[in-house]
Structures are given as C-alpha cells and as structure tokens.
C-alpha cells in the first residue's frame, strides 16, 4: 500500500478558517478564530487521511517571479485584516510545536512549493492529498493527486475532493486545460488580466472547441463571434502572459527530505502549553488521548441476540438505577416504532458495562422497546442523545404520569450541551465525548460513511456495534459531567423544569402534525400563477420588450438604462435590484410596484404553494420538525417545512393559512401573547413609568407617543403612534439611530432625538440596557430571567461593527430569551392541563408568541379558557401577560 502525503496551503486555509469561524479571542485579547478553525480542519484531515507525511506551505511577503513578469499581479487584493494578520505567526508557532514541517521560500508562492512537492511525491509512488481553498491548484490534480477544498462554517467543515476526472466533470476541461481556462478568462482575485470580452462561459466553449490555447490561436479566424475573435487577436500577448501567471511551477527549487515531513507525536508538551494559552479548551482533551483508550472502550462492548442474556442485562440496568441508551433508528421524524427502521438498542450502565442488542430473533423491536419503556416507568434514570427521537420507544408501554410531561428521570445530553454552548452550529456525540469526557471516539462517517444504520448493521456489523456502544457510553458518562456544569452555570432548573419537559411537548406536536387540504393548496397555487402571468404581461408591456424578470442583470438594464429610472446603483455585475432599492422607486414607477408584487407572488408560489405540497404525508398532515437546540436565545424554530414564517404582511400571503384545517368535528383555537417582549422589558428593567403605562391598560404605543412627543394622549396622531411603536419595539432590539431612521424614513438626527426622548421617558430602561452591555463585557454572557446564558464573544472583537452587534445582542437576548422561556412554560402547562383533564384537544403549532390547538368542538369553551389562563399565568411579572384568543374553521379564520 502506498504511503500518503498531505500538503496544506497555509495562508489559504487560515484565510478560509478566519472567515468561516465566528470571531474568537483569548482573555489576553489575541484573536484565535483562524487558528482554531485551521486546527479543526487539520484534525479532520488527519483522522480521514491518516498520512505518513505532512507539510504546510506559506506565502512570503516579498514579491515573487510573477510580480517580475507582471507588476500588477495581485495588485487588486485588499490588505489582510489585522485580526487575521496577527494569527499567522501564532499558527506557525503551533505547527512547529506539534512537529509539523512548514515551508516558505522567497520568490515562490505556496502554490509553487505545493505543486512541486506533489508531483515529486507522485513520481515516487505516494498518494497525495493537497488541501487548499485556491482552485488554481486543480491544475495539479491527477489519478494520484487529490485536491481537497474545505469549506468552514462555524465548527463545521465540509470538503470537496477533486481527482483529474472530477475536474473534467465539473469544469469540462482537463487539469492542464484549467490553466488555459484561466489564461482566457483571467482571475480577478489574483489580478490576472485574461482576454477582454472572454468570460468563464466563453472560455469554456472555446476550449471545448479548440482544446488548447495554442490550437485556438492557430485557428483563431474560425472563432464565430466577431467581438471575441477581434479581442483574442488584439490581446494575444495578454493571453500568454496570463497563461504564465496562472501556471503553477512544478519544478521549483524546493529542497525537502521526506523524513523531515514524517509525522511523529503531535500532542507535545509545547503544543499543550500553547493550546492552553490560546484557551482552546475543546481541543485540550486531544493531548490525553491514546489509541488504546478507544480500543479499551470497544473491547467492553457486549453484543447479544440471546433473549435470556438480554433479560439479564435489563435486570442489571434496573439494579444500577441509571443508564445511558441509544435507540438505533434513523427516523427523521417522530414516529411509531413500527414505522421506523429500528435496528436495536444500546445500553451502558457502568464504565465496564456496555451492551448492544440488535433487533433480531426473539429480540423484536416491540420487545426491546417494551423493556426500555419498563425502565422508564420504573423510574430508572435514563440519558440519551436527542430525546425526541427516543420517545416512541420510551412511551411504547404507556405514560409514566398522565398529568405531567414525565421527564424527571430523563436526561438529554444534546439539550445539556446546547444550554452550555448555544452558539455552536451542530452538536455531535463525538464532540461531546471529546469536550466533556476527554475521549476520542470514531465518528459515524468514519465508521460506515453514508450508510444508514440498517445498511451498516447488514454490511459492517462490527462498526455498527462500535458506533452503538460508544454512543450509549457517551450518554451514560457525560450525564454527571454535564449535570455538574449546568448546576455551576445556574441552569439545572432551566434544564429540569423547562427544556426537558418541553421536549416531550414538541414530540407530541410533531407526531400530531397539522392537517392541510391539498386541493385548496393547489387552487391557491393556481390563483397565484394567474396573477403572476398577468403581472408578467403588464411588466413586459410597460418595458416595451420581453425579458427575464427573474434576472437581476436584465432587470437592472431595463429599469435603469432602457427606461432611465433614477436611483440605480451599479455594481461589478450590473445594477442592484435589491428590494430596498426598488421599494424607494415603487411609489413613482408603477412597473417597479408590479415587479415587487411579482417577486412576492413567485416566492409564495415556490416556497408555499409548491413547497408545502411536498411535505403533506399519507395522513394528509404536515409533520414539521420543531428544533430546540438551534437558536442562541432559546427560541424554538421549525424546519421541514418552516411553519413559523408563513407570511403575514400581505393579504395574499395570509390566505395560505386557509389550507391549514382541523379534522372533522374540530376547530382551531389560536392564542397569541400581546407585546410579550415589551412586557418582559417592563418587568426586568423595573421602569416605573413603563410598568404604570401597562397597568393603565391603555394603548402602550399611544402612551409612549404622548410622553415622547409631549402631546396629550387624546391628541396623539396615527403617525406619532406608528413612530412610537417603532421606537418601542426597536429599543427591545437595541436599535441605533441609523436603524430607526431607515425604518421610519426620517433623518438620523430625528431618530436620535426620538431615542433620547424615549430614554428620558423610561430612564430605567436605559439603565437596564446599559447594565446588560457592561455585564456582558465583564462576564462574556447575559442571562434570561430563568438563568439561560447567551455568550457574546463579539464584544471582544477589535472590529467596530462586530462589537456594535454584540452590544445589541446583549440588550436583546435577556428580553427575547425570557419571552422564549415563558412561551415554553406556557406550552408545558397547557399540554399538562389538556392531559390532566383527559381532553381530546391537542397542541398543533407554536409560532413565536402564538399557540394553535386543534380543538374538539365539545371542548371549545373549556380549551379556550384553559389556554388563556395557562398562557397568562405562565410567569408572574410586575405587569400582566395579555393574550389575544380567536377560534376558527381554519388557521386564517382563527388568526
């Protein structure tokens, strides 16, 4: 088997990491996000590639031979941001501490070093993986050289791989042809001129026809487009100059003994101390990892399909009193066990006690789930990863407590790590093992690539057992660690009394789903098409020609060149036709108003009329997924499909709600909190004026307008009320004078005056908001009324815009997060009361501040009363929580 060499383009990957990972810095103020992102990519590569050799090449500041050929080379590049620049020497220091060979050479770019080493290694029989964000290196790809282009977003890294065949499949040219493609089309990033009037599409077509640059110029008279032909002839020198500039040198005078690049012990004492200084707590666990630790864990996994053996295991779990478990099923939605591809259970009830029970023979899915459910009913402590997906099994023998969510003995490690670090993009078991237990476990992808669990069990049983057993172990071992951290952070009560119970409520809501009339949805879509076609005809007539309304380029040319409308902003790719540009022109230009309506309707058609139809299941219902661990503020989100962003601004958008209906003999009861965030602000700020305004039970926006604009309450105009409303809600989100000026179409000075007058009216609100910012700067986070933490790393940024964003987050998160917590409490109390009274009505949807119940007609009055009561009394604030309640035959009528 060939040895493997991994080559990394240092500056390129560091740059990708810098822009892909949110701003991070240590307590000394040193920016670290690029280094952190680079290391995550590096570790991922090492785990996937397992190379014998590794080298990282960096660019040097000095000019290269390309600058001698063309002084303007890379002349258009912006300077490296200071926050990134300061991390380059730190990155090199980290690599040196880990014993990783780095290279840089005056006169050469990193690409030339990498290209030379890659081709040399290929000749010597090695397999090569070259990692860079620069697609110029695709010209180096071959059957033995793989170009890997990572994309980093937050802590998540995905990689595109290209061998020679992949380059040709993607770009229609060979790797060698990729250089000639650049020679013709140029490269704005590197300021390679190329041939004027030849873009990527034209260049690709020319190379498909003529194969090479030399052959193209030998037959240049055969180029059919006159303008292109003339440009090619006039700019032949530029074409060949660009070819030279784009060509990576694979014969550079680079000296490297492969032994210098051979990987040794990465986790050295020097590297450990550096990681500590950089405060990479999540990565420190790697220094205590040895391969034997993983081996020792897998050796403890006991696999059995024997009924008697399995019964003994469940008895042992009962005696232990607590276990970690994994339901081995790939279901994406909450379903009955018989509707899922259930493969078995994994249990861990001690450091040495791990069992995997495949669903085969006498160990049927029903029997295994029944045994797990018995553990739950017996009050055994059970911890798992993503509890919602485990509820079908846990509840297969019925309810533990009919009157409550019954989650006191359950622990979801996913929810726990989310509360401790709500800024992560995703949470995986291997991350929990690494961060909480200092253990390395192999990822699902490493074990069986993209196979489903059912496929893995059939094709790679040993890897399946390893995955299942280690997952159960992580759920068992992480629980006490996470519990202690939640306690220390003051979030144990939040976890026990809000997050765990609401997970049960969300499971039931997903399972119930909401009924949708497919025929009415189709009719709604047809009506949209009719109006879209009318608008298209009208727009073309007004323009005097037919064009693609959906093409920003064509639309910009029609509006700002052909029709001569004023206010156009030209960019590199043409005129901007963004909504904010067009909205300013709509009042005076009917065609623009029609275009905006056209855009809105086409979005309604694609996203809702067509999009929702794809999610209607066999039962006629849409079963959305409610996400509990996505938003940093604690709000619940909805996906597949997103039912929380059903349009409300236009009547035609609102009409989509008519297709959502209750089942026969039922109606919808809809309750919506009134101004919950403003009421929360009044309570947590303690502002007496704002509290009194709410206690007066008068129009809060009219009261604010009266006070801010020094106008008697009865004489407040509609405009003053609208402006006061914008200020009221804007303050909650830390709005600036600029933001308010844009919202109200007033000057920045006027907006600043409004805000000053608002704070003069409600001084304790200003004091509260300022204190939130100061506390966040000192602690690194803000908290809700219920203890939920929202970290704000942006406050340590040297970038003014980032810091300003952080300040707005510090002001808003305690308010929005508290409102989200109150809504969750309301959902829990409503759900429990429906069950306590043994009613048939069920919660269907949660949309921000709104709850929708599918209500049995015989229970309508009782449900309306209990829904309003439980929402009003979900929290005891210094101002009352008010609820608007409606009923209807569909969601539209109930709203």
Q: Which residues fall in each region the model found?
A:
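Conserved catalytic core of nucleic-acid polymerases
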Residues: 511, 609, 623-624, 628-631, ...
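Function-dense linear segments that define catalytic or interfacial modules
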Residues: 346-351, 420, 427-447, 467-469, ...
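Noncatalytic, basic helical substrate-engagement surface that gates or grips nucleic-acid strands
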Residues: 1-131, 135-161, 238-241, 247-255, ...
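Active-site-proximal helix-loop-helix substrate-binding element of RNase H-like nuclease domains
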Residues: 101, 154-182, 300-301, 338-343, ...
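Conserved "right-hand" nucleotidyltransferase catalytic core of DNA-directed polymerases
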Residues: 235-359, 378, 451-648, 667, ...
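C-terminal polymerase-core module
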Residues: 530, 534-537, 541-593, 760-808, ...
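Non-catalytic nucleic-acid-binding/docking modules located in mid-to-C-terminal regions
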Residues: 2, 50-55, 100, 123, ...
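Short active-site loop/helix that positions an aromatic residue
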Residues: 14-20, 138-143, 345, 388-399, ...
């Amino acid at each position: 088997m060939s040895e493997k060499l991994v080559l990394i383009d240092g500056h390129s990957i560091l740059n990708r990491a810098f822009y892909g990972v949110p701003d991070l810095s240590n307590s000394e103020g040193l920016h670290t996000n690029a280094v952190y992102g680079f290391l995550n990519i590096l570790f991922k590569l090492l785990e996937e590639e397992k190379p014998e050799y590794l080298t990282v090449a960096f660019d040097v500041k000095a000019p290269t031979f390309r600058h001698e050929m063309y002084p303007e080379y890379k002349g258009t590049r912006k300077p490296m941001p200071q926050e990134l620049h300061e991390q380059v020497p730190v990155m090199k220091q980290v690599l040196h501490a880990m014993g990783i060979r780095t290279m840089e050479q005056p006169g050469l770019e990193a690409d030339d070093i990498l290209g030379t080493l890659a081709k040399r290694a290929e000749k010597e029989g090695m397999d090569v993986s070259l990692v860079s964000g620069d697609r110029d290196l695709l010209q180096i790809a071959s059957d033995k050289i793989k170009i890997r282009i990572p994309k980093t977003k937050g802590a998540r890294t995905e990689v595109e791989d290209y061998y020679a065949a992949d380059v040709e499949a993607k770009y229609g040219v060979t790797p060698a042809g990729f250089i000639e493609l650049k020679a013709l089309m140029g490269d704005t990033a590197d300021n390679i001129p190329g041939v004027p009037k030849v873009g990527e599409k034209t260049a690709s077509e020319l190379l498909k026809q003529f194969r090479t640059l030399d052959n193209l110029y030998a037959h240049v008279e055969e180029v059919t487009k006159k303008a292109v032909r003339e440009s090619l002839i006039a700019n032949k020198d530029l074409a060949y100059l660009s070819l030279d500039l784009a060509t990576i040198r694979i014969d550079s005078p680079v000296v490297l003994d492969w032994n210098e690049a051979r990987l040794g012990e990465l986790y050295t004492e020097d590297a450990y101390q550096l990681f500590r200084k950089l405060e990479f707590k999540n990565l420190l666990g790697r220094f205590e990892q040895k391969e034997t630790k993983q081996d020792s864990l897998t050796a403890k996994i006991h696999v059995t399909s024997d009924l008697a053996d399995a019964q003994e295991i469940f008895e042992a779990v009962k005696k232990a009193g607590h276990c970690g478990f994994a339901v081995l099923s790939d279901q994406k939605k909450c379903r009955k066990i018989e509707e899922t591809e259930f493969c078995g259970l994994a249990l861990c009830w001690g450091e040495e006690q791990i069992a995997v029970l495949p669903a085969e023979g006498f160990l049927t899915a029903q029997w295994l789930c029944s045994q797990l459910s018995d553990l739950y009913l017996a009050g055994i402590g059970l911890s798992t990863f993503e509890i919602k997906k485990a509820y079908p099994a846990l509840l297969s023998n019925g309810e533990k407590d009919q009157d409550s969510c019954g989650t006191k003995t359950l622990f979801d490690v996913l929810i726990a790590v989310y509360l401790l670090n709500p800024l992560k993009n995703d949470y995986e078991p291997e991350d929990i093992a690494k961060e909480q237990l200092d253990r390395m476990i192999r990822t699902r992808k490493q074990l069986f690539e993209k196979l489903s669990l059912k496929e893995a069990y059939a094709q790679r049983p040993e890897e399946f057992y390893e995955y299942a057993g280690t997952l159960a172990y992580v759920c068992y071992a992480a629980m006490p660690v996470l519990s202690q951290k939640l306690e220390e952070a003051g979030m144990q009560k939040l976890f026990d009394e809000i997050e765990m119970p609401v997970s049960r409520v969300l499971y039931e809501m997903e399972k119930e789903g909401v009924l949708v009339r497919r025929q009415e949805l189709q009719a709604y879509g047809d009506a949209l098409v009719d109006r879209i076609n009318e608008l298209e005809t009208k727009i073309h007539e007004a323009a005097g020609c037919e064009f693609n309304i959906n093409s920003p380029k064509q639309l910009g040319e029609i509006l700002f060149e052909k029709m001569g409308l004023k206010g156009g902003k030209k960019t590199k790719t043409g005129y901007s036709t963004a909504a904010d540009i067009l909205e300013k022109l709509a009042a005076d230009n009917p065609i623009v108003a029609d275009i905006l309506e056209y855009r809105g309707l086409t979005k309604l058609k694609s996203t809702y009329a067509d999009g929702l139809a794809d999610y209607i299941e066999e039962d006629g219902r849409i079963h959305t997924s409610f996400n509990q661990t996505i938003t940093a503020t604690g709000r619940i989100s909805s996906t597949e499909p997103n039912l929380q962003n059903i349009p409300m601004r236009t009547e035609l958008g609102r009409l989509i709600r008519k297709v959502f209906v209750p089942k026969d003999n039922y109606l919808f009861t809809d309750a919506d909190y009134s101004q919950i965030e403003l009421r929360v602000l009044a309570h947590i700020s303690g502002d007496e004026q704002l509290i009194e305004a709410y206690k007066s039970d008068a129009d809060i926006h009219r009261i604010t307008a009266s006070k801010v604009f020094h106008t008697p309450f009865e004489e407040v105009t509609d405009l003053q009320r609208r402006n006061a409303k914008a200020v009221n809600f804007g303050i909650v989100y830390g709005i600036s004078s600029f933001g308010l000026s844009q919202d109200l179409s007033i000057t920045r000075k006027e907006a600043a005056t409004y805000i000053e007058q608002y704070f003069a009216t409600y001084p304790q609100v200003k004091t509260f908001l300022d204190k939130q910012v100061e506390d966040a700067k000192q602690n690194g986070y803000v908290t809700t009324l219920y203890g939920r933490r929202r970290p704000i790393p942006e406050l340590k940024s040297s970038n003014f815009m980032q810091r300003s964003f952080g300040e707005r987050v510090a002001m808003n998160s305690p308010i929005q997060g508290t409102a989200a917590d109150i809504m969750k409490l309301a959902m829990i109390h409503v759900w429990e009361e429906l069950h306590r009274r043994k009613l048939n009505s069920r919660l269907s949807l949660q949309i921000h501040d709104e709850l929708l119940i599918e209500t049995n007609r015989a229970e309508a009055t009782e449900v309306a009363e209990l829904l309003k009561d439980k929402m009003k009394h979900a929290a005891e604030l210094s101002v009352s929580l008010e609820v608007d309640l409606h009923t209807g035959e569909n969601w539209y009528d109930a709203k």
